[in-house]
């Protein structure tokens, strides 16, 4: 969220109290208060890593991941297709996929609906170049080449997202761990971002 220069007090959907201040977010973690930067403070880092993406889409992805999904411990993989290409669904398993309602990560008014949908679905969510969410529940398959090239000591959600971005260089993945951190992958590499609690 963007800071208006004032301190805002909020109780999340999950009942967690938090304060938005001009310098960060103060959040109750169940046993102690934690301070973390806002998504806006991460924007220079993310824009530098993904300069061709529209700012409003990157900001929306960061806000949704770090201020909605992460505090609620909702694991998610958001695949942002920077340059759509025809017949580019290799590596995708649509057997459990669902068409998305007309929602966009660039529209803050859509976050509550996206939050609800992502809390009830697993696998990857596809986001087009303009921020439109096109599908939910898409499985990711790795090529043999990406399995060789990307050897990541992490959970399945992170490995599959990293390998997918290695196979699809025009796609970046925002991965939200169920324990909070948000990681951005591009070309098979973790290129930024740890946004939960005290992870740094």
Which ranges hold each PLM region?
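Divalent-cation
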Residues: 1-200
């Amino acid at each position: 969220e963007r800071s208006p220069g004032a301190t805002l007090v909020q109780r999340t959907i999950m009942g967690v109290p938090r304060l938005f201040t001009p310098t960060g977010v103060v959040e109750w973690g169940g046993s102690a208060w934690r301070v973390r930067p806002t998504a806006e403070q991460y924007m220079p880092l993310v824009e530098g890593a993904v300069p061709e993406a529209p700012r409003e889409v990157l900001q929306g992805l960061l806000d949704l991941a770090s201020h909605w999904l992460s505090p609620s411990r909702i694991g998610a993989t958001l695949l942002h297709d920077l340059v759509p290409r025809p017949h580019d669904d290799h590596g995708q398993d649509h057997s459990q996929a669902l068409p998305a309602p007309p929602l966009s990560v660039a529209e803050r008014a859509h976050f509550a609906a996206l939050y609800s949908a992502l809390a009830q679905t697993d696998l990857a969510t596809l986001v087009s170049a303009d921020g439109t969410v096109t599908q939910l529940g898409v499985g990711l398959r790795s090529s043999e080449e990406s399995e060789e090239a990307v050897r990541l000591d992490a959970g399945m959600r992170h490995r599959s997202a990293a390998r997918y971005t290695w196979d699809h260089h025009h796609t970046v993945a925002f991965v939200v761990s169920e324990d909070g951190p948000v990681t951005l992958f591009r070309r098979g590499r973790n290129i930024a971002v740890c946004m939960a609690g005290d992870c740094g």
